[in-house]
């Protein structure tokens, strides 16, 4: 029995070394997985490295995981001494097999705080663990801590160099944000309705992206295709609701500052903000009504193409509520100089609009470049923007017509039930 335990210990020590060696040979490993193998058939290492993929034969897990787990617990109980390299190797192996073991992440936090470990290493480790365990809450929690630590180090280094937030630091933070968006997208694709992944993405936009309008609009654009391919993913659509709500908050703040809606633009090319920063919000303009209408159009296409998905109807409810809130706030914030009073009439439609908003409603969009001879052509996506006036397409009546059309033409009982529920909610909002 004692000899068998010694053999197992020798085996797992070799496996830990093989995992460490694999990372040294190829620092660009981007995925980990288990290789189904009930028992060891050959006298070789169970660690397989093929290009940038790391595989672990399943037969060794029952020996490896308890070994590294107990070893780390003995260290925390001060019954076993492990040097820096041993701690890094043991926690790395353990977290690749069980990333929700909080103690291992806490040990690595201490190593980072002592300057022994670079937070970038933990971001790489977490990214790798998420390829196998994309919903791991402890991995996402530690990732946010490591990101805060990394950004703090970058800012402190810039201040020490008396460069304030130099362009290099800003570019580095922007690169971190882009990498996090990629990690979140990969994790969301590996696990349906990955709430932890989308919540992390929201956190990145809030704390690293500072809710910049540029980032918000870019994220709306970049996630459009994703949600179109995952029409039942509540978390993905909730993320788009967060983006639009954030843009709405910026618009409402602008009402307080200038007494009218931000200058609206009809040219699609100008919807994304300048890449060189945002010194002053009042100098920024974006077309929120246009973005909301685009979201409603996208939702309508998905509802027609994929009947019977409750997620789409819940999302439509949220977006129409944002439109309703925007128009109410805009009417309440209107001033005589720039607008005429605007309140919902008895039918639930907007009886009057600000002159600024009304001009957007009535003026055709310059999608053909008629006013600019330098513009040449336009894509099919821009062609699709030739539509009815915004006032009509965003009204209660238009929504009721849409619902009636769905109820008349659909053959899905689920679709009929969701449409009827949406109509009931719409009428309650109209009566409010």
From Swiss-Prot:
Tell me which domain of life the UniProt entry assigns to the organism this sequence originates from: Eukaryota
Q: Which PROSITE patterns match?
A: PFTA
Q: Which GO terms describe its cellular component?
A: cytoplasm
Name the source organism. Answer: Xenopus laevis
**Official protein name in the record:** Protein prenyltransferase alpha subunit repeat-containing protein 1-A
Per the record, the similarity remark reads: Belongs to the protein prenyltransferase subunit alpha family.
Q: Which Pfam families did the record assign?
A: PPTA (PF01239)
Any one GO MF term held by the record is: protein prenyltransferase activity
Keyword Zinc-finger listed: no
The reply on keyword Transferase is yes
Q: Which keywords are on file for this protein?
A: Prenyltransferase, Repeat, Transferase
């Amino acid at each position: 029995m004692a000899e068998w335990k010694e053999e197992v210990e020798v085996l797992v020590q070799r496996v830990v070394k093989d995992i460490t060696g694999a990372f040294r040979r190829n620092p660009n490993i981007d995925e980990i997985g288990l290789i189904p193998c009930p028992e060891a058939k050959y006298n070789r290492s169970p660690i397989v490295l093929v290009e940038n993929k790391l595989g672990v034969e399943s037969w060794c897990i029952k020996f490896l995981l308890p070994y590294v787990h107990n070893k780390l617990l003995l260290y925390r109980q001060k019954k076993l001494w492990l040097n820096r390299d041993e701690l890094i190797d043991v926690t790395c192996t353990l977290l690749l097999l069980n990333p929700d073991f909080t103690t291992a992440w806490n040990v690595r936090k201490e190593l980072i705080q002592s300057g022994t470990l670079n937070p970038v290493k933990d971001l790489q480790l977490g990214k790798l663990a998420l390829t196998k365990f994309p919903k791991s809450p402890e991995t996402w929690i530690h990732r946010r801590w490591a990101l805060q630590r990394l950004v703090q180090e970058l800012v402190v280094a810039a201040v020490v160099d008396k460069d304030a937030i130099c362009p290099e630091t800003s570019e580095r933070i922007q690169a971190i944000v882009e990498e996090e968006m990629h990690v979140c997208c990969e994790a969301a694709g590996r696990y349906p309705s990955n709430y932890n992944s989308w919540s992390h993405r929201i956190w990145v936009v809030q704390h690293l992206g500072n809710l910049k309008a540029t980032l918000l609009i870019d994220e709306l654009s970049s996630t459009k295709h994703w949600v179109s391919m995952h029409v039942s993913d509540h978390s993905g659509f909730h993320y788009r609701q967060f983006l639009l709500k954030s843009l709405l908050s910026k618009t409402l703040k602008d009402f307080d500052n200038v007494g009218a809606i931000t200058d609206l633009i009809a040219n699609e090319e100008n919807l994304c903000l300048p890449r060189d920063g945002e010194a002053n919000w009042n100098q920024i303009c974006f077309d929120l009504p246009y973005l909301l209408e685009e979201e409603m159009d996208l939702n309508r296409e998905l509802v027609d193409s994929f009947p019977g998905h409750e997620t789409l109807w819940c999302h439509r409810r949220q977006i129409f509520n944002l439109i309703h809130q925007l128009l109410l706030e805009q009417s309440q914030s209107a001033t005589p100089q720039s607008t005429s009073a605007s309140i919902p009439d008895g039918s639930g439609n907007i009886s009057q609009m600000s002159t600024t908003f009304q001009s957007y409603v009535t003026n055709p969009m310059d999608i053909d470049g008629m006013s600019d001879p330098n513009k040449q052509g336009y894509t099919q996506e821009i062609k699709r923007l030739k539509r009815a006036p915004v006032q009509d397409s965003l009204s209660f009546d238009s929504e009721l017509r849409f619902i009636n059309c769905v109820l008349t033409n659909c053959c899905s009982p689920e679709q009929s039930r969701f449409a009827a529920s949406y109509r009931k909610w719409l009428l309650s909002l109209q009566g409010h």
